[in-house]
């Protein structure tokens, strides 16, 4: 059965099968890998608030609702007390709103932190607002060209594709967002039910205490013990007097008073607990109402039907626009004449333009709706964190109440019960005393019976000893003469005396030593007998004789004083078949010994060669004499063989043999059964080992499968996120390409117009240049003719008189100079460039200079590579020589030629400065191409944009660091300890002064020296001595010292503490928060001068709240 796991942080859901997880630990590990929540921070709840534990993990299939709610325990860290209606009346609305806003802000920060740690994408950041189509700004009614129409329609189709992707994305995440919101609402409701179950347990514990107290009240005997004491115990006599002597009346009266006070104490505690439980119940009810209100809030302003209608309308209009655009673009270019464009294309494009505006309006409405939905989800998440914090706060309070009930109330109720039991025992004293007398009588009876049994045992021992003595005498009488060669006097009975002494001895050591000696002798004799029988076998004596000795030795070995005990066993106590077989074997041996004893009870029936020698007479006939028979019987009785007396008939013998046969068959059957069961047990054990091996292999395979499933799940999620990122990147690139395409189209149109204007201007300039060249050729030809004429005149004049030569030469040179100057001025004024071109050239150089100046002001330098290409590089320290006042928008930029460091700029400026003195057009084209290089491939724009992005990133980082440092500064500011110029809410160190209030002389000077102008850098040894002295003085009895705030840095003002609540008692120092400061002036020494300060002294009376003490 699959279960839906709901994430309480994001609302995501996944389907899992709990059967693939071995335990709860593996399930939590899977959720941790899936959602990035630490395993230790995961809390799992079933429906109705049931907590998922190891004990109920395997019983999840019993639940009706297959859902598991996953909580991050860090969501409960923002504990805050919920506000009820009573709180709203008690506190001001402004304070409540401020607290709520503060908590919501902290919840938003916690949500961002958790989502960032889990790397959960923020959909608000992924939304891109739809941008207008380039077709909207086109003035179609004024007329358009075929090229413009095709370009705009193609661009509009790209815009329409991007817009459809955005709208489909809005629709997809809209449904998911609604599902997530519903999942979050169910998670919040389940957590509230969990709190209800927890509170129900505490209420049940409280009710059990109340019921127990009521039972104690109903069965209370504290009011009847006096009557019982006076009317019964004082009149009922026992062995040693009246029973009232066993009851201390004074102590019972004391306990009665204690019980009454304890009853009131327990009642007051339970009432207080009831009051707090009701308060928490009201807060829970308030949380329930708020949760219901949150669930009832609609996700969007418009209904789903309206959204679907908008989606359908958008799709319909988009299909119409695409079809109309394709109809135009698919037609042959030859059809696009001016008339066709005017009659056919323009109306269609106007209609497309209107529908494009409608599409933009619909898409923006969907965007706004999606943005509102995501904002609502985020606000809902914040509210969930706030409510979870309130639930955690109530649970903490309920937990404290539970501990209080379990510890304090239970202790009081236990004491209450013990006191009631003591009062109840007073009424039970007559019965208990009667039982005591009966028990004492029973012990007397037992003692009497025990004495009788001990006397009987003593008599039994004497009888057994006498019987043993008789047996020995009879044996000696029959065999004593034959045993004389063994050199042992068998007529002595020292061993019986030793046993008697041992019984009368109190030494445990002697008893143990006696028994150990007997065991040693027994082992020694046993070894001798075994060796003796072995030697008889080796010597080849009669087998019958050896068998008699072996059987006799076996009987003697098995004989003991307790052989009369019945050998039947209680089979109900036998737990092992081997023990049962062993007991049957023992019984068989016992029966065999009885048969053997019966067969050899008569000496005459012994085999030949046993005590039958030729040199000795036979003392007994075939039938044993009565004395010998009695001797055998006594011997058998002493050795514990009394059961043989019952086997006197052949019938009994037959029964015993039959029983031995049956028991042998049972033993054989049991041995076979035992062997069969042993084989079955071995087979079962081997199967169990195989099962364990298979189980281990299955567990290992399942672990590998779980790891592989987790890895595949993570990979799937990564691929999904990567696909989303690629889709968003594609949309952004499409948008940027659309914008760039539009800009390029606009630039192309502008350049086309400029090119046409330049072509016209160029043709005009070429015609003027041709005219100027013709005029220049004419002037050169005229000048050459004039020079030839002048030369001829000069040669003619040279022949004149010598006295007129110098004057004629001067006049001629003057004429030549004038003609030459006229020619040069004509050439200069005939420059090939018009004033408009010169003006454009100047403006172009100014724009270029300003751009280079802007680059260097933002730390970028224009350089040239070895290949002749321009580069813009980031150079540190470049702005040190530039103006630092450019942040002022009203400031004017100073001349920039002297502050630009770029070598490229200086080369281009040199080219520009040579243009007025050079009429070559190639130099002008070289200047224009050099300037154009900086704007090729968006070099200038890319450098500026990237630089501003770096500046923006740096600004964000610095803003974040500034915010954190501001928080630290505020924290340190709040914890700062003031030492001068005190104000309200400052923290100050308060110390006692050196003098008491009762001493008036030199008090002010000592106070001033104690707290003014303190050098904080001095060593602390002297301060320690002063503190020690002040401690000694503070410990003096009946001395009241005034307290003052510690001051430093030449602070001459005196700040005395207003100690109304005696907070300084038994303290050496404390840190307090100043709550009030009152300025005082000593106007009269005798009045209003509690500290005996000089006249006109300004001092301050401080009220402070204690923050920290020693």
From Swiss-Prot:
Q: Name one GO cellular component term.
A: phagophore assembly site membrane
Q: Which UniProt keywords apply?
A: Autophagy, Coiled coil, Membrane, Protein transport, Transport, Vacuole, Virulence
Which Pfam families is this protein grouped with? ATG11, ATG17_like
Q: Where does the protein end up?
A: Preautophagosomal structure membrane; Vacuole membrane
Q: How does it sit in the membrane?
A: Peripheral membrane protein
Cited InterPro entries: ATG11, Atg11_C, ATG17-like_dom
Q: Which domain of life is it from?
A: Eukaryota
According to the UniProt entry, its GO molecular function terms are: molecular adaptor activity; protein kinase binding; SNARE binding
Cite a single GO BP annotation.
reticulophagy
On whether Protein transport is a keyword of this UniProt record, the answer is yes
The keyword RNA-binding belongs to this UniProt entry's keyword annotation: no
Coiled-coil region(s) = 264-309, 651-803
Q: What does this protein do?
A: Involved in cytoplasm to vacuole transport (Cvt), pexophagy, mitophagy and nucleophagy. Recruits mitochondria for their selective degradation via autophagy (mitophagy) during starvation. Works as scaffold proteins that recruit ATG proteins to the pre-autophagosome (PAS), the site of vesicle/autophagosome formation. Required for the Cvt vesicles completion. Contributes through its regulation of pexophagy to survival during engulfment by host phagocytic cells during infection.
Assembly information from the UniProt record: Homodimer.
The record's family statement is: Belongs to the ATG11 family.
**What is this protein identified as?**
Autophagy-related protein 11
Question: Which source organism does the UniProt entry give?
Answer: Candida glabrata (strain ATCC 2001 / BCRC 20586 / JCM 3761 / NBRC 0622 / NRRL Y-65 / CBS 138) (Yeast)
């Amino acid at each position: 059965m699959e279960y839906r796991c709901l994430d309480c942080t994001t609302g995501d859901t996944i389907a899992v099968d709990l059967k693939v997880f071995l335990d709860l630990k593996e399930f939590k590990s899977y959720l941790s890998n899936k959602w990035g929540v630490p395993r230790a921070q995961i809390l799992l709840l079933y429906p109705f608030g049931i907590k998922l534990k190891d004990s109920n993990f395997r019983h999840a299939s019993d639940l009706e609702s297959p859902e598991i709610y996953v909580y991050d325990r860090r969501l409960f860290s923002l504990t805050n007390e919920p506000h009820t209606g009573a709180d709203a009346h008690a506190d001001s609305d402004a304070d409540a709103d401020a607290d709520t806003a503060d908590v919501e802000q902290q919840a938003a920060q916690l949500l961002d932190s958790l989502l960032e740690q889990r790397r959960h994408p923020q959909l608000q950041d992924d939304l891109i607002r739809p941008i207008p189509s380039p077709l909207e700004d086109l003035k179609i009614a004024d007329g358009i060209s075929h090229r413009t129409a095709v370009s705009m329609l193609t661009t509009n189709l790209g815009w329409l594709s991007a817009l459809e992707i955005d709208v489909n994305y809005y629709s997809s995440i809209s449904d998911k967002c609604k599902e997530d919101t519903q999942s979050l609402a169910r998670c919040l409701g389940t957590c509230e039910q969990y709190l209800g179950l927890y509170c129900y347990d505490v209420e049940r514990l409280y009710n059990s205490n109340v019921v127990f107290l009521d039972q104690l009240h109903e069965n209370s005997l504290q009011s009847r013990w006096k009557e019982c004491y006076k009317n019964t115990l004082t009149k009922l006599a026992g062995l040693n007097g009246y029973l009232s002597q066993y009851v201390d009346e004074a102590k019972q009266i004391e306990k009665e008073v204690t019980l009454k006070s304890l009853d009131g104490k327990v009642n007051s505690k339970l009432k207080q607990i009831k009051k707090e439980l009701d308060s928490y119940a009201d807060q829970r009810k308030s949380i329930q109402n708020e949760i219901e209100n949150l669930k009832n809030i609609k996700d969007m302003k418009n209904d789903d039907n309206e959204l679907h209608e908008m989606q359908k309308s958008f799709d319909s209009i988009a299909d119409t626009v695409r079809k109309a655009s394709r109809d135009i673009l698919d037609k042959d270019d030859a059809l696009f004449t001016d008339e066709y464009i005017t009659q056919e294309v323009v109306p269609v494009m106007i209609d497309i333009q209107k529908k494009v505006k409608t599409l933009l309006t619909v898409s923006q409405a969907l965007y706004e709706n999606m943005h509102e939905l995501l904002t609502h989800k985020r606000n809902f998440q914040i509210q969930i964190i706030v409510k979870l914090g309130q639930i955690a706060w109530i649970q903490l309070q309920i937990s404290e109440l539970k501990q209080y009930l379990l510890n304090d109330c239970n202790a009081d109720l236990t004491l209450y019960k013990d006191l009631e039991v003591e009062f109840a025992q007073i009424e039970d004293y007559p019965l208990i005393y009667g039982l005591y007398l009966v028990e004492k009588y029973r012990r007397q009876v037992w003692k009497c019976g025990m004495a009788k049994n001990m006397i009987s045992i003593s008599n039994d021992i004497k009888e057994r000893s006498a019987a043993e003595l008789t047996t020995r005498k009879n044996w000696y009488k029959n065999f004593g003469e034959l045993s004389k060669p063994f050199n042992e006097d068998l007529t002595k009975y020292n061993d019986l005396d030793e046993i008697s002494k041992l019984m009368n001895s109190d030494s445990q050591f002697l008893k143990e030593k006696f028994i150990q000696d007997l065991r040693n002798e027994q082992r020694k004799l046993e070894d001798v007998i075994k060796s003796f029988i072995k030697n008889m076998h080796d010597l080849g004596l009669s087998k019958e004789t050896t068998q008699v000795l072996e059987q006799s030795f076996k009987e003697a070995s098995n004989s003991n004083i307790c052989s009369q005990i019945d050998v039947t066993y209680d089979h109900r106590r036998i737990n092992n078949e081997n023990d049962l077989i062993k007991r049957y074997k023992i019984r068989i041996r016992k029966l065999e010994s009885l048969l053997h004893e019966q067969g050899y009870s008569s000496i005459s029936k012994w085999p030949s060669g046993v005590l039958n020698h030729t040199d000795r007479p036979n003392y007994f006939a075939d039938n044993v004499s009565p004395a010998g028979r009695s001797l055998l019987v006594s011997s058998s009785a002493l050795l514990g063989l009394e059961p043989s007396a019952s086997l006197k008939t052949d019938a009994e013998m037959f029964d015993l043999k039959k029983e031995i046969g049956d028991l042998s068959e049972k033993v054989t059957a049991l041995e076979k059964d035992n062997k069969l069961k042993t084989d079955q047990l071995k087979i079962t054990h081997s199967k169990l080992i195989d099962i364990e091996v298979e189980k281990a292999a299955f567990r290992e395979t399942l672990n590998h499968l779980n790891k592989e499933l987790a890895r595949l799940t993570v990979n799937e999620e990564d691929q999904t996120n990567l696909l989303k990122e690629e889709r968003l990147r594609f949309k952004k690139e499409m948008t940027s390409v659309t914008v760039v395409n539009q800009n390029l189209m606009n630039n192309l149109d502008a350049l086309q117009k400029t090119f046409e204007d330049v072509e016209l201007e160029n043709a005009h300039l070429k015609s003027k240049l041709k005219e100027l060249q013709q005029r220049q050729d004419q002037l050169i030809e005229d000048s050459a003719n004039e020079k030839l004429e002048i030369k001829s005149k000069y040669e003619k004049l040279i022949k004149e008189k010598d006295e007129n030569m110098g004057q004629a030469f001067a006049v001629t040179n003057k004429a030549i100079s004038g003609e030459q100057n006229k020619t040069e001025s004509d050439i200069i004024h005939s420059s090939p460039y018009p004033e408009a071109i010169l003006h454009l050239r100047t403006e172009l150089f100014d724009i270029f200079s300003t751009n280079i100046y802007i680059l260097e002001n933002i730390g970028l330098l224009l350089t040239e590579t070895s290949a002749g290409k321009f580069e813009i590089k980031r150079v540190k320290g470049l702005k040190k020589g530039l103006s630092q006042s450019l942040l002022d928008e009203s400031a004017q930029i100073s001349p920039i030629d002297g502050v630009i460091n770029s070598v490229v700029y200086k080369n281009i400026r040199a080219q520009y400065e040579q243009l007025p003195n050079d009429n070559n057009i190639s130099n002008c084209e070289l200047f224009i191409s050099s300037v154009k290089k900086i704007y090729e491939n968006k070099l200038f724009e890319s450098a500026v944009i990237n630089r501003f992005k770096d500046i923006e990133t740096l600004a964000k980082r610095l803003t974040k660091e500034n915010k954190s440092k501001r928080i630290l500064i505020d924290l340190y500011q709040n914890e700062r300890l003031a030492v001068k110029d005190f104000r309200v809410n400052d923290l100050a160190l308060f110390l006692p002064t050196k003098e008491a209030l009762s001493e008036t002389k030199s008090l002010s000077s000592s106070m001033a020296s104690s707290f003014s102008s303190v050098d904080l850098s001095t060593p602390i040894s002297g301060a320690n001595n002063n503190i020690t002295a002040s401690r000694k003085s503070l410990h003096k009895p009946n001395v009241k010292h005034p307290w003052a705030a510690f001051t430093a840095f030449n602070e001459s003002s005196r700040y005395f503490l207003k100690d109304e609540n005696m907070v300084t008692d038994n303290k050496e120092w404390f840190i307090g928060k100043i709550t009030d400061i009152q300025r005082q002036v000593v106007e009269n020494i005798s009045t209003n001068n509690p500290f005996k300060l000089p006249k006109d002294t300004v001092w301050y009376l401080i009220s402070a709240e204690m923050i920290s003490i020693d």
